[in-house]
């Protein structure tokens, strides 16, 4: 009789533990889905902003190149042009549509997001400095 009682209690504990593990797995998978959706939305917004910034920078670079193509440049102008060229190279290196679709299909990785933040931070700083210098010069 004691043996039956021990087996019954053990069975109840095991089934409660199994239900607990199953509930934990379900809540984790739901959390992963929500996190992936929010990251996808953030990435979409970032892509739109990056495309707009890239188009604006390309236009600015063309205008500056035309302005300084035939004229003499000061050291400051030369530095601004070097910064803009570096920014354009950085933006072009981010523009790989094949890799972007692969990343979307396999999910988002925190390392990739951190890498993009590390790239975009200095790029935006350089753009701000370059535009500030140009506005000072024009004004």
UniProtKB/Swiss-Prot annotation:
Residues 19-43, 74-118 form a propeptide. One of its GO terms (biological process) is defense response to fungus. Residues 1-18 form the signal peptide. The modification Asparagine amide is found at residue 70. The modification Isoleucine amide is found at residue 138. The keyword RNA-binding does not apply. It comes from the Eukaryota. It is found in: Secreted. Expressed by the skin glands. Keywords: Amidation, Amphibian defense peptide, Antibiotic, Antimicrobial, Cleavage on pair of basic residues, Cytolysis, Fungicide, Hemolysis, Secreted, Signal. The keyword Transferase does not apply. Its main location: secreted. Disulfide bonds: none annotated. GO terms for cellular component: extracellular region. Maximin-4 shows antibacterial activity against both Gram-positive and Gram-negative bacteria. It also shows antimicrobial activity against the fungus C.albicans, but not against A.flavus nor P.uticale. It has little hemolytic activity. It does not possess a significant cytotoxicity against tumor cell lines. It does not possess a significant anti-HIV activity. Belongs to the bombinin family. This is Maximins 4/H3 type 7. It comes from Bombina maxima (Giant fire-bellied toad). The lineage of its organism: Eukaryota, Metazoa, Chordata, Craniata, Vertebrata.
């Amino acid at each position: 009789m004691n043996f039956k009682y021990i087996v019954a209690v053990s069975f109840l504990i095991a089934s409660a533990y199994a239900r607990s593990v199953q509930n934990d797995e379900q809540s984790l998978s739901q959390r992963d889905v929500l996190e992936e959706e929010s990251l996808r939305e953030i990435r979409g917004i970032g892509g739109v902003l990056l495309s707009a910034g890239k188009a604006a920078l390309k236009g600015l670079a063309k205008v500056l190149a035309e302005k300084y193509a035939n004229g003499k440049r000061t050291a400051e102008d030369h530095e601004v042009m070097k910064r803009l060229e570096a920014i354009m190279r950085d933006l072009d290196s981010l523009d790989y549509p094949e890799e972007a679709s692969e990343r979307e299909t396999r999910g988002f990785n925190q390392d990739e997001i951190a890498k993009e933040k590390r790239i975009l931070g200095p790029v935006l700083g350089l753009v701000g400095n370059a535009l500030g210098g140009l506005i000072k010069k024009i004004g």
